[in-house]
Amino acid sequence: RWITHYPIGEDSTGKFYWKVHPQLELQIPKSNPFLGNVYVLTDGFTFSATSEFSSIVKSNKRGLIVGVETGGGYYGNNSGGMLRKILPNSGIKIYIPPIKYHMAVKDLGNYTRGVIPDTLVTENIHDIVLQNDVVLKAALEIIYTDNLKLYK
């Protein structure tokens, strides 16, 4: 038996579908958008909505992405209301993400990776252990340099 807490249905072919969602209608942009520079910091734990946001920023060239390749895919992901199944022989509980999200992004061909930052920052285990946030430091350096160019 499948257990879910979301409005997910199954059609006659065995495919699951999302029944309703309040934001499936046309989204109208605000009349006063932010016009400054946008910097998005990413790392290997950038999944789900944050990876989707990074994909849109990169595809639409709306900001500079700084950091490490995202853990989530460029084209989308499988997530949403998790379906729980208890395997009959072992009794092991498994959770399956039934919803496949496709992002409205520029096609990069046969691309199977996460979002690659515009400025790639190399992290190492020492930085992580010492809590040395090299991604933040790189982003702040870029922002500082960009501001110097503006005020020269």
Features from the language model and the residues they span:
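C-terminal "post-core" interaction segments
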Residues: R1-K152
